[in-house]
Regions:
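Residues that scaffold, gate, or flank divalent-cation-dependent active/transport sites
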Residues: 1-150, 155-157, 284
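Core structural elements
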Residues: 146-149, 340-354, 397-404
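Catalytic palm subdomain of template-directed nucleic-acid polymerases
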Residues: 150-180, 254
Length: 471
């Protein structure tokens, strides 16, 4: 029995709508294929074995046992020949039984592999947002990501379904079914809905833990379901907001289930986790005071950029060129929010054929947001750590921000020279903002190793128009 008096808790009618395998479903629909009956995956850089699987249809996941994110070399078949890959199978401990090989090759030939089209996904997301707005005001809608979001239907239920003999729970289900229908008719995408006549948390838990398994892809969790459904969640990490690190800390306290968390002392949880511990306790008891009408705005902890290179970079000069370009790209974002960084970090991932896997570096610096200075710091960090080898992925990250009007001068600094450089940087940013990033480029950006021009054409780090990896 919960210690919470739910009669005192606020109630709202919430639908949390999630597009089923969104990118893959959009690709299926655009080709006239059934999203649930087609084996399809969206793969960036499908022209090489390091191609990144961004999304896949439910059938693809079922057949090949893969989640959304993975690499082409994780598949049991060669993406070019569609033949069974004994090398990949051996590396992953898969069967090489002839029947299994035939099964994989049959499905490999039937599988559609397509490049990402980020502009199309954004276009479909906008269409879905317009559908949401037919059932609630803009203030009632809180996008959670490109393929999911909350709708507060509290004010809409009686408007769309005025029959007073129907319960609010049934009205919420009926209206959610209409939203599902409209999304499918407009976009060809199936959607799953977690519902709650209580709060957003329970709607999200209903989606993650039940709705995805029901025949109509809907489920409702409200206050009267807390002790049976919320406490019945089998794994701590299946609960919203609990990752592997938090799970380990909870287990050290002797907490292995959501029910145990809900009945633990909130004071002891606060002692271990601070205010977050109290929030965990309330959430485990189904209480959530977040408001869809006031979207959560996370405090910025840093800005970064990461990319997987199109090939192995072996020459140090080429690696440093990409590092410099990325240092500049993140510096531009830093200036756009009028901040300076005091901490620079890099992460370098080696080719999978190298013995070493990766290394990281970090340094504290005087506050700056100037491209030239940040490039020097990034390159300096790299040179301290790099001992040769083929590099395949690079990340640059700035953190520990201060306001841009803070400047630290030494006796050897020339204030006029600093001001001159800042004015030049401001002018360059303004030109690029109006006419595009590639308007002003250094000569080395035209070399084959450069990534700045290619990446300026991407949306969300991936191809906007679907030509990625195609000749």
């Amino acid at each position: 029995m919960s210690m919470i008096d739910y009669k005192r808790e606020p109630k709202s009618d919430i639908a949390f709508v999630d597009m089923k395998s969104f990118y893959a479903s959009v690709e299926c629909a655009s080709r006239g294929l059934h999203p649930l009956k087609t084996s399809l995956c969206v793969m960036s850089r499908a022209d090489n074995s390091n191609g990144l699987i961004l999304a896949s249809s439910p059938l693809f996941k079922e057949v090949f046992g893969k989640s959304n994110v993975g690499r082409a070399y994780d598949l049991p078949f060669d993406i070019h020949t569609r033949k069974f890959s004994y090398y990949n199978a051996k590396r992953q401990g898969l069967s090489t039984d002839p029947a299994y090989i035939r099964f994989i090759e049959e499905w490999a030939r039937a599988t559609v592999i397509v490049p990402p089209r980020m502009d199309l996904y954004i276009e479909k997301n906008i269409e879905i947002q317009h559908i949401f707005q037919q059932y609630g005001s803009i203030e009632d809608i809180m996008p959670y990501s490109i393929d999911e979001g909350f709708i507060d239907l509290t004010s809409s239920l009686n408007y769309f379904i005025p029959n007073q003999s129907i319960s609010r729970k049934d009205k919420l289900d009926m209206l959610s079914a209409r939203i599902q229908r409209d999304i499918y008719r407009k976009t060809g995408v199936y959607s799953t809905v977690g519902m709650s006549n209580a709060n957003p948390l329970l709607a999200k838990l209903a989606l993650d833990n039940e709705a995805k398994k029901t025949h109509n892809m809907r489920a409702n969790w409200s206050y009267n379901d807390v002790t049976t459904k919320v406490w019945g969640i089998s794994r701590l990490t299946d609960f919203w907001g609990i990752g592997a690190a938090i799970e380990k800390r909870l287990e050290k306290l002797g907490i292995y289930t959501i029910k145990e968390l809900a009945n633990y002392s909130p004071d002891l949880l606060k002692k271990e986790f601070g205010v977050y511990g109290v929030q965990l306790w309330y959430h485990a008891n189904g209480v959530d005071e977040s408001n869809v009408h006031v979207p959560y705005k996370p405090k910025s902890k840093g800005l970064g950029n990461s990319q997987v290179l199109p090939r192995d970079y072996v020459k140090q000069q080429e690696i440093e060129l990409v590092l410099s370009e990325m240092a500049e790209q993140v510096a531009i974002r830093l200036r756009s929010i009028r901040k300076k960084t005091t901490t620079v970090s890099i992460s370098i991932g080696y080719s999978r054929f190298e013995e070493s896997t990766s290394f990281r570096g970090q340094m504290k610096i005087e506050p700056t947001n100037q491209t030239e200075e940040l490039q020097k710091y990034v390159i300096s960090l790299f040179r301290k750590k790099y001992n040769g080898g083929a590099v395949r992925s690079i990340s640059v990250f700035y953190s520990s921000f201060v306001d841009e009007n803070i400047t630290m001068l030494s006796l050897f600094d020339d204030p006029e020279e600093i001001l001159k450089k800042e004015r030049l940087q401001t002018a360059i940013d303004a030109i690029r903002s109006q006419f595009g990033f590639t308007t002003l480029q250094k000569a080395n950006s035209l070399t084959s190793a450069s990534r700045s021009i290619a990446r300026s054409k991407l949306v969300g780090g991936h191809s906007a128009g679907g030509l990625d990896g195609l000749k």
